[in-house]
Amino acid sequence: MQLEVILPLVAYLVVVFGVSIYAMRKRTAGTFLNEYFLGSRSMGGIVLAMTLTATYISASSFIGGPGAAYKYGLGWVLLAMIQLPAVWLSLGILGKKFAILARRYNAVTLNDMLFARYQSRLLVWLASLSLLVAFIGAMTVQFIGGARLLETAAGIPYETGLLIFGVSIALYTAFGGFRASVLNDTLQGLVMLVGTIVLLVGVIHAAGGLSQAVDTLHALDPKLVTPQGADDILSLAFMTSFWVLVCFGVIGLPHTAVRCISYKDSKAVHRGIIIGTIVVAILMFGMHLAGALGRAVLPDLTVPDLVIPTLMVKVLPPFAAGIFLAAPMAAIMSTINAQLLQSSATIIKDLYLNLRPDQMQNEIRLKRMSAAITLLLGALLLLAAWKPPEMIIWLNLLAFGGLEAVFLWPLVLGLYWERANAAGALSAMIVGGVLYALLATFNIQYLGFHPIVPALLLSLLAFLIGNRFGSSASQATVLSTDK
């Protein structure tokens, strides 16, 4: 173990727990559900931008994405910039309308919104189960990424790192709730920004300058400096699929959507769009360029996902590497706490309280259950991450795609199409989810497109056809989640 690397990381974790304790003490008056899962809808613009960005930027962006850039070259850096409008799309399309309706219905979760709009218990159960299955896959990826970071950069055995990482996140999320999550996201967003810039400068310096780094890549494989990338992987169909999966489809991610119902006012969302887009641009460009140029410094890595943690140790002094280790750790932690909290909210609010509505005001029981379920989910994820695959980006994209295939059209059409009904939404969710699962499982790529493209197209068609066989439900005027 390298103490110079570990000490700054321990200090960072202490700060994270300190923020969580502060958040617990700052809980405002109101019902437990609204405060614990939404922070009483009090986010300002900077916090909104940072939490949305930190939630979106995950192990895939700090570990898997740069790993792919290492393997395929500078073309992957250009591909990564396709994600630039993600915050603008999320807040622009969902933002105001979603927040207004959420306040009208007193919605705490995404499924509250779906029930208020479609008045279908079956739809809520299907959405809840889909969310839990996909989130378990997505969070497993984050746990693997965190443990690999500690293994490579700090010399901590994978299993030990997994325990340290998993227990820390489960504890601070369980007891701090949404307020702790978004405050830590803001801290983690700042850490990511500084860390990304420092590492990129270090990589360019170690490679002998930008020009020398590109020349080295060209000598290794001329395809590494072409827009198509190594193995000509970046075809038009691939790039279109990637844009749908990691940019447009983000609108349908539940942990992103829930951020759109928890901000304070219109000024916050406008500021959030501007700041969030700038932060995403810096992080995506910086991390992926560091991964691509890292091949000029480390040409012989056998596991591409190890490029960022290995570069940290190679190009930075040990203490600086420890400080920077907090950046990808921050990216991973912020994504997990958002998904962990959303999973807990789904089990408590959408499943348990649907079966036991008489427990809505039993705040003592709800507090205990929320913490216990969050800790239990954390333990299950530790078990799932114990034997990891080689490249985590594909597993992460698989989980992302599943969520988008199920939630995108019921969300967007539910907001903007008055005639949308439960029959259409259920048809879209079933067709999108099942088709995506089949295509992804058997690796079927029609005309070279990722499964998310045909899944979303046929899901939309299923919505339109199914909608003709249903009738519009009267929308709820208020949901009994708060008084």
Predicted regions and their residues:
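Membrane-embedded helix-loop-helix hairpins and adjacent transmembrane boundary segments
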Residues: 1-483
